[in-house]
């Protein structure tokens, strides 16, 4: 009898798993879940811990044993999705960026989105001009250390904080100048609100880049934003497709297709190649979820989507959450006393924070920021200002950032991040999908921009300009096989987008090294 009880107790313990979720302020939340617990259960625990009601904008990220990143699906078992050995480690992050973050109902929600965008700025995912970078950093200073105080803030105080992958002494002085003269008296909530209003106007607001190749083998980054689908190449946003122009998303193996219907009933198919079939499926699922969230009027309109054609076996997926319009309507009905916000102050540091796969010590949730170590490539870039209208290819190089190797103030064993006035690639940031160590080197090759601003229809006219034999050889056998010619009817023509022409590059393959952020 006793042995049966002990055996049952043992089996019960085996069905419990420890989960650690890294929060946006770098603290950690640890809990225990049952073997059959769904993702929704874990997410609800987190939102209760954070006192968060406007929770539809957020999600939980994890990396599987093959180093592929995923968003946790709330309708499926947590344990079965992770497929790794416990204890499990995940991250709480913004999944759907609010189209207007300043319009969020509660301050706690705005604060969490502020923390996410601050991370995007630091990791190089949010790109901006030098003047905008200085203003954003000054808002962060005001929100987290308060008014300038000569007694507390000596000369060069802004240099002790890390806002970007790289920054220069000139930029540090500009940040301090704005903080001293323009922001005095602003509360943390006001500074965070102003930060959100400014960030929302930037071209790469909400961008979570997926590294791919176009049909010519050029590195590209695909992303989904509140406003539509974007393609980044080099230091430019080369294409933008509004959500109401996207008619279908599909993938087959490593090939991703985006179907576009624009004016005059022209139907176009954009084709890109992901590093792995798993990465392509992740890209497709992200696209399906973003399109449903931002485009649909109500969640009852959501349909199960197939990844392939009707007569071929493919993946099926259905977005399970509410859509943006429903979330806004629900938020308007929130009536409660504003929850207390435990803000995490900045920790002065001259080294880059890092997100690693190594074990972490447990901490009390929402405690002070931790210093972490991250390997980030150089610089920030400038993207041309845009009103989120038509897809374009730009040759503008105005007001950009320069990657600087080291500041004169740096110690011999200390790497200091610097920004000045040149350009950098999104590959320099911590990417959300697997990228080989060698592929970063390939992506960082300098780009040569040619051609004037053009629409997607104009791209069709340039389709005939195929790569030379030498360029095709450099791309390698795998890409040549993928890029064999595609046919199409008169009413539906497949268009291979060829963004800015790059210098000749050699195909180096893709790896699976990815940090958990």
Swiss-Prot record:
Composition skew (Low complexity), residue ranges = 498-517
Q: Where is the composition biased (Polar residues)?
A: 388-398
Named from the GO MF annotations, one term is:
cytoskeletal protein binding
Region listing for Disordered, in residue ranges: 344-367, 385-408, 485-517
Pfam entry (one): FERM_C
User: Is ATP-binding there in the keyword field?
Assistant: no
Q: Where is this region: Interaction with ROCK1?
A: 308-353
What is the protein name given in its UniProt record? FERM domain-containing protein 5
Question: What organism is the protein native to?
Answer: Mus musculus (Mouse)
The encoding gene is: Frmd5
């Amino acid at each position: 009898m006793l042995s049966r009880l002990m055996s049952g107790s043992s089996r019960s313990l085996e069905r419990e798993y420890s989960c650690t979720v890294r929060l946006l302020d770098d603290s950690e939340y640890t809990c225990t879940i049952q073997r059959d617990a769904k993702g929704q259960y874990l997410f609800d625990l987190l939102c209760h811990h954070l006192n968060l009601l406007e929770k539809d904008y957020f999600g939980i990220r994890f990396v599987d044993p093959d180093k592929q990143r995923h968003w946790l699906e709330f309708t499926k078992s947590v344990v079965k999705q992770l497929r790794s050995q416990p204890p499990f480690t995940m991250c709480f992050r913004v999944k759907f960026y609010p189209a207007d973050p300043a319009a969020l109902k509660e301050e706690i929600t705005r604060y969490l989105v502020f923390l996410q965008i601050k991370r995007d700025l630091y990791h190089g995912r949010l790109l901006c001009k030098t003047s905008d970078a200085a203003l954003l950093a000054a808002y962060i200073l005001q929100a987290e250390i308060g008014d300038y105080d000569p007694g507390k803030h000596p000369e060069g105080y802004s240099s002790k904080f890390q806002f970007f992958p790289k920054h220069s002494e000139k930029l540090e002085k500009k940040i301090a100048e704005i903080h001293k003269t323009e922001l005095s008296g602003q509360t943390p909530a006001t500074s965070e609100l102003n930060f959100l209003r400014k960030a929302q106007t930037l071209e790469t607001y909400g961008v979570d880049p997926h590294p791919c190749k176009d049909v010519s083998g050029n590195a590209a980054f695909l992303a989904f934003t509140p406003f539509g689908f974007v393609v980044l190449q080099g230091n430019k946003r080369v294409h933008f497709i509004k959500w109401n122009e996207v008619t279908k998303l599909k993938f087959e193996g490593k090939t991703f297709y985006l179907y576009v219907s624009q004016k005059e009933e022209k139907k176009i198919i954009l084709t890109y190649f992901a590093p792995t079939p798993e990465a392509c499926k992740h890209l497709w699922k992200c696209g399906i979820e973003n399109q449903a969230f931002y485009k649909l009027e109500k969640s009852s309109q959501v349909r199960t989507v197939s990844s392939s054609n009707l007569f071929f076996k493919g993946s099926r997926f259905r977005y399970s959450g509410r859509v943006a319009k429903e979330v806004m309507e629900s938020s308007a009905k929130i009536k409660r006393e504003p929850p207390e916000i435990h803000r995490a102050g900045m920790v002065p540091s001259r080294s880059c924070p890092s997100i690693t796969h190594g074990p972490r010590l447990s901490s009390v949730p929402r405690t002070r920021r931790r210093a972490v170590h991250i390997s980030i490539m150089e610089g920030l870039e400038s993207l041309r200002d845009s009103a989120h209208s038509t897809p374009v290819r730009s040759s503008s190089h105005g007001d950009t950032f320069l990657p600087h190797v080291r500041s004169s103030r740096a110690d011999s064993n200390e790497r200091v991040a610097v920004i000045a006035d040149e350009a950098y690639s999104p590959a320099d940031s911590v990417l959300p999908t697997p990228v080989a160590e060698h592929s970063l080197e390939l992506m960082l090759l300098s780009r040569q921009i040619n051609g004037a601003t053009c629409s997607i229809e104009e791209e069709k006219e340039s389709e005939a300009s195929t790569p030379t034999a030498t360029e095709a050889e450099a791309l390698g056998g795998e890409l040549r096989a993928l890029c064999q010619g595609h046919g199409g009817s008169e009413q539906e023509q497949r268009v291979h987008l060829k963004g800015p022409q790059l210098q000749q590059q050699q195909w180096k393959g893709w790896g699976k090294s990815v940090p958990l952020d």
